[in-house]
Amino acid sequence: MDREVHRMASLRREGSMWRSGGDVFSRSSSRFQDEDDDEEALRWAALERLPTYDRVRRGILAVSSEDGGAGGEKVEVDVGRLGARESRALIERLVRAADDDHERFLLKLRERMDRVGIDYPTIEVRFENLEVEADVHVGNRGLPTLLNSVTNTVEAIGNALHILPNKKQPMTVLHDVSGIIKPRRMTLLLGPPGSGKTTLLLALAGKLDKDLKVSGKVTYNGHGMHEFVPERTAAYISQHDLHIGEMTVRETLAFSARCQGVGTRYEMLTELARREKAANIKPDHDIDIYMKASAMGGQESSVVTDYILKILGLDICADTVVGNEMLRGISGGQRKRVTTGEMLVGPARALFMDEISTGLDSSTTYQIVNSLRQTIHILGGTAVISLLQPAPETYNLFDDIILLSDGQVVYQGPREHVLEFFEFMGFRCPARKGVADFLQEVTSRKDQGQYWCRRDRPYRFVPVKQFADAFRSFHVGRSIQNELSEPFDRTRSHPAALATSKYGVSRKELLKATIDRELLLMKRNAFMYIFKAVNLTLMALIVMTTFFRTSMRHDRDYGMIYLGALYFALDTVMFNGFAELAMTVMKLPVFFKQRDLLFFPAWAYTIPSWILQIPITFLEVGVYVFITYYVIGFDPSVSRFFKQYLLLLALNQMSSALFRFIAGIGRDMVVSHTFGPLSLLAFAALGGFILARPDVKKWWIWGYWISPLSYAQNAISTNEFLGHSWSQILPGENVTLGVSVLKSRGIFTEAKWYWIGLGALLGYTLLFNLLYTVALSVLSPFTDSHASMSEDALKEKHANLTGEVVEGQKDTKSRKQELELSHIADQNSGINSADSSASRKGMVLPFAPLSISFNDVRYSVDMPEAMKAQGITEDRLLLLKGVSGSFRPGVLTALMGVSGAGKTTLMDVLAGRKTGGYIEGDIRISGYPKKQETFARISGYCEQNDIHSPHVTVYESLVFSAWLRLPSEVDSEARKMFIEEVMDLVELTSLRGALVGLPGVSGLSTEQRKRLTIAVELVANPSIIFMDEPTSGLDARAAAIVMRTVRNTVNTGRTVVCTIHQPSIDIFEAFDELFLMKRGGEEIYVGPVGQNSSKLIEYFEGIDGVSRIKDGYNPATWMLEVTSSAQEEMLGVDFSEIYRQSELYQRNKELIEELSTPPPGSTDLNFPTQYSRSFITQCLACLWKQNWSYWRNPSYTAVRLLFTIVIALMFGTMFWNLGTRTKKQQDLFNAMGSMYAAVLYIGVQNSGSVQPVVVVERTVFYRERAAGMYSAFPYAFGQVAIELPYIMVQTLIYGVLVYSMIGFEWTVAKFLWYLFFMYFTLLYFTFYGMMAVGLTPNESIAAIISSAFYNVWNLFSGYLIPRPKIPVWWRWYCWICPVAWTLYGLVASQFGDIQHVLEGDTRTVAQFVTDYFGFHHNFLWVVAVVHVVFAVTFAFLFSFAIMKFNFQRR
């Protein structure tokens, strides 16, 4: 090869002798010759003389005047240190407009490589006889109810031990598929939902789940998956957008680029520079700088990042945070592009992209796919892209098509032959139908008939298997088989094509990148750390004033109080680490994604999260120790002060590491919040304070020796009590006071135990961090979803595959309905005509047709700080600029515009869904001013994010919506019939028993969730319906089903408005009118679409300079293209201004004027009540839904009961028979310790584990309340009331086990008091957890606030410092501390009436309980009432918070 390159270079040198002096090597270098710039030539010559290593790191950069230099000045730069500004300016010069300049830029790159004979590496992917099978539960067994979860767990263990049969049924996901993916060709993967597209992409990318049964093989250039690293050779781009919300778009992509590295670009560049020097070729400066900069790894912001931002159209939002549910960020379409860009910045040569166009308008999709096509064709990549609804022009960009259906390859080969194959099978694509849409529908039993074209033969359903068999005999299929029979010649594989190293950059670089990201996130989450520090400061001030030195003496009695103060310091610091739990779990989904993509190993993630927390630990612990140490009156020695500080630092680190480890093992908020308190409880109970070491049972003593708290307790106690303050010798004893106190509690008395304790804590810190790293290395992301299918869906799948008619299928009815409704585009066909009455049956419950008109509507928000920092002086950012229009009954309106045009914003404003910002303008409903309370009753809003309760079924979701939104006059039977009609209409009947689940985690697929969202609104029978992106995320067939549903809804006389991104021709032409907006929030066309889009085309073609539409081109795509910002700039026009001066605008103004006046004889909307159903019905419905939600949420309900059983058995065995011993004071302390630990820790677990459940349901509540389904109180009632029976079961389990094992006195009264106090204690803790969520915006802050109060309750519980010994200024708090009342009730009911005298004391047990703790037996009834009051108060505050605070930002 080198000889060949040398020969080419020689030929070029010889040829240059007889050319006319010009440079023959490159068009791009002619400018270099023409300029005749001596200084530049000298600079280049100097560069050429550098060694290759230095030469590839330096280049000549043109600095334009706006970048700080003189116009066009050339400067020599180190490309490894190219600034962000220079990088962006360079990309702007190279790719000014992604549409026009991108191909030219790539051709320049290719030309430069071709001139010296260097090839880009290419990859051919082959898959042969690939079969993927999964085991699924069929029918109700797949629902995760409490019963099923127990049965499934027992069954799984039985299967593993081969003692029980496997009840799951095998389901083939991919059935014996074979094919070839060629380099330099774009392959489009099509298929209806459930056809196996994602599974095929994952198989090709080498990322299939280990639980699946896989046979067959996938090879890259003839190499098996085990011979290289597929995760780095190929990039799989998921359909789920998982990103860290606090990072900006640029930071997200830059981090990805930094981790993935530059691949073989550097080696290629070195070879290129060497050959160019030998051939005396001078490259284009900008191309040279780009190639050099893109080959330099380890940069915080790379030129490749700026390039990808540019071609994906993300440069406009590059410095905006990505955002999440609670943090406003970029739009859904932009987030989808970030997911794509995250992988494109890497060096992977093969791309497997899963539904990358969801949420994008068709012009943006076209631009992205076109950029990818240019890259693949010119630079020799390999790409398989799955798209849901590709527009015809996007479809035409692809070279090859793979059509999957029910796990079989129906067609794979050149795009040109696909229609030929289906005509060969007897099916033809209609004229105004997108080919991609036709392909996705033609294999479906319900849609196939309409495309039959053989008039000489009657139509008969052609099953998928028949298509697949026919394809093998079709000429395209035969040629693939022939090619597969010849093995790939491995000698043709470029050595740089397949990655063999596991990670893209060195370990040092990976660690540096993750440290930088962790620092950035700490800065963005500074509020959390400040909050924790303030929390600890307040806690320290309370502790300091509770254990006040002036009220405490150094004697044996107060020695116990000092021990309590030390234990509380340990407890506080330990609890402080608890917040790590929620913060860690929230970051894990993104971590698992990046780990599996081999961005970095687990240790590169865990080390920064540990090391960078250390300075914060110094601050937090410092705050506590510096405030409390001397004020409490601990030993005044400076060395002992710093030793206590050092020990608490080690404990805090150990605690944080422990909770990170638990989060890493649990991987789920509910599971982690269950096992977090369990570990705390185990360590505390065996730590030597609650139960003294001599009293620990011999079968539990091992627990004492492995509890970190026992080492901390020994170390902190010896540090204090061996000090000078405690050195006096007691009369009649030969040991110091300090040693005497230590001995009385079974604590070691040698000074060495401080160092042993410190060493143990540091050892545990290392151990837990190591275990956390191991957990994150080996565990997969948490999923509680078991693969399941309904029986109907399985039968339907089988029928589609084989053609066998399934018994009981309502085939005739549904096919007749489908055929009636098939041609959406035809406004006069089955959709609008009388024969569609069958499909409208049930959609005609009585309602009043209403119009909505709006005039000069403006919406603004406070100017973001980032924009103010850039010098913008206005106080507000205007998002809608005086928008006017109207929507009428029976008219289907499309609200369109490019991403960022303000479509969803306008819809939110009109629907009254905005929670912030400033709204101006006039909005009227049938002429009357809009009132949100009544408007919510007659309107429906289908949100883009499909938000539903995850633990109910599809049918239950619809029942709930209809129950609360249909008026009470509609009886139960009519309601059920109506629900069945809607389910039939939206094709959800086969999914009626399917669990909804969480998006991207479990339950329904994207398109099924979308249909459910629409059905939930349709069952409310609204007059006006808003739909935000109803077809986003759906394939062509599902989109057609949805649009038929929408069309039918309009035909009943309702007003329907849809925002829509990338409609196909037939979907677009199903709309009657179009409301088109441009970026910036202004309308540019409001009017009819017309037959075959004639009116729309006529309007825009009438504007000077607008290009005419090509035959067969999608009008929606054409319209977005000709009205883009780039076109406005090129034509020098403002489309919004043209619209305002048009006749159409005047007609619309007159229409708005007419609709703004109430019709004669009409009355304003008025309802006797705010809600459709009575308050009682709302409460019952909410309770009904929560009942199902809890029953099917075993990760919360079952885990909590399991936790309770474990704790009960642990406590029962730990405090075995201690209840019968009441002879000594220590016996009472031990018994009280068992009560104290149980109350505090089981209570905390209940409080913590309910929070994630409430957070998920609160998001659903925001949607349902906005829809006017119910008020806040019934929701709160349902959430609170459903806990009562579950907590009753929990109390009985705990109470019976513990009461009998500890051996408390068996009398009916004492046992019932014990159960009563435990029940209400668990209730108030659970309601307190709910209240914390209600008062805070997210889980993390709720966890921090909760733990703050747990600490205060712990302090004033009366266990660490009895109420009579608390300083008078804090004693009042005991009366409002719930835990203090619980201990009062438990201790007084068990011991307050025992009259025998204590050993070594003159008092009876009852007197001691009264004197020492201040507990009176005759006060029990008051204590009981207070317990009820606490539970009711927290439940009420939860209701109040839910009613008053809305943390959703819209």
UniProtKB/Swiss-Prot annotation:
SMART domains, per database record: AAA
Superkingdom in the source lineage: Eukaryota
Membrane topology: Multi-pass membrane protein
Keywords (A to Z) from UniProt: ATP-binding, Membrane, Nucleotide-binding, Repeat, Transmembrane, Transmembrane helix, Transport
Binding residue positions for ATP 2: G897, V898, S899, G900, A901, G902, K903, T904
Signal sequence bounds: none
ABC transporter domain boundaries: 158-431, 852-1104
Domain ABC transmembrane type-2 as annotated: residue spans: 509-721, 1177-1391
UniProt cross-references to InterPro entries, sorted A to Z: AAA+_ATPase, ABC2_TM, ABC_trans_N, ABC_transporter-like_ATP-bd, ABCG_dom, ABCG_PDR_1, ABCG_PDR_2, P-loop_NTPase
Binding site for ATP 1: G191, P192, P193, G194, S195, G196, K197, T198
Regions crossing the membrane: 527-547, 559-579, 614-634, 646-666, 670-690, 756-776, 1198-1218, 1236-1256, 1284-1304, 1311-1331, 1341-1361, 1372-1392, 1422-1442
Single GO cellular component term: membrane
Pfam families cross-referenced by the UniProt entry: ABC2_membrane, ABC2_membrane_7, ABC_tran, ABC_trans_N, PDR_assoc
SUPFAM superfamilies xrefs: P-loop containing nucleoside triphosphate hydrolases
Location(s) in or outside the cell: Membrane
Job of this protein: May be a general defense protein.
Family, similarity comment: Belongs to the ABC transporter superfamily. ABCG family. PDR (TC 3.A.1.205) subfamily.
Protein name according to UniProt: ABC transporter G family member 37
Organism: Oryza sativa subsp. japonica
Gene expressing this chain: ABCG37
